[in-house]
Amino acid sequence: MEGAGAARKRSRPDTANGGAAGGKRSRETESFQTGLSSKLKPCTKFFSTIGCPFGEGCHFSHFVPGGYQAVAKTLNLGNPAVPAPARAPMDHAAGGNSHPASSGKTRMCTKYNTAEGCKFGDKCHFAHGERELGKPAYMSHESAMAPPMGGRYGGRPEPPPPAAMGPPAGNFGASATAKISVDASLAGGIIGKGGVNTKQICRVTGVKLSIRDHESDSNLKNIELEGNFDQIKQASNMVGELIATISPSTPAKKPAGSAAGAAPAGRGGPGGRSNYKTKLCENFVKGTCTFGDRCHFAHGENEQRKGAA
């Protein structure tokens, strides 16, 4: 009798413990399975004007393809365009500031521009910036996955830069035209054989060069340069160097009435010009001579000739 009683006493705690453990495991399994099955159902509070207070810990789904429209059709919530009136709308679950909720974001969020920021993010019933004013308070899953409007501590997003209106200020009115009046006898030397000199000036500087008759003096020619200011300045310097090379002793605007003025008409070689290669080229010493072998000045003492007696 005592042995049987002891056996019963020993078996009762085991049975009790086993029963308790089994009951606990069965309840956990049931709760787990219930949680899995409930995640397949949409949260009716989340898709209402009240909002779900459980957040990510909710056992029901907060993300349904199609958003509120699909949930309203599935659960027969009536007209999806007119949400049910809220019984206890709140600004924030932890803030305690009560504001009436509506189908659109009509007021600014009081927590968004603070140091701690708004913890509700895209689910907030209030606008995070002026661009969200008037937008629906409840957006679908696709819109919730869109990039945020700003950082946690950011304020209003910066507007895009305005489009450029017309050409830049630096290029406005840059094109210009300049005239250089020279002796008509120098025109052939400035043009060069086959236009080699004028072509080189246009190729190096990028200007448009043309030689025309003077308006009033038949003994002069106008060299017209068209381009921007830097191009015209560079071309003018090259024309001045060319004129000095052709006739270093003849002024640019001196009429060709004397023998000295008529002499520079031809380019010629050592036999055709008495001052050919008789002086050193100043630009060659500086390394800025652009005429090369066609230069009428000596590029070094080995090319320098003695002037005619």
UniProtKB/Swiss-Prot annotation:
Q: Where are the zinc fingers (C3H1-type)?
A: 37-65, 103-131, 275-302
InterPro entries registered for this protein in UniProt: KH_dom, KH_dom_type_1, KH_dom_type_1_sf, ZFP36-like, Znf_CCCH, Znf_CCCH_sf
Q: Name one GO biological process term.
A: regulation of gene expression
Carries keyword Lipid metabolism?
no
Please give the CDD domains that the UniProt record associates with this protein: KH-I_AtC3H36_like
Gene Ontology cellular component list: cytoplasm
Please report the name of this protein according to its UniProt entry. Answer: Zinc finger CCCH domain-containing protein 31
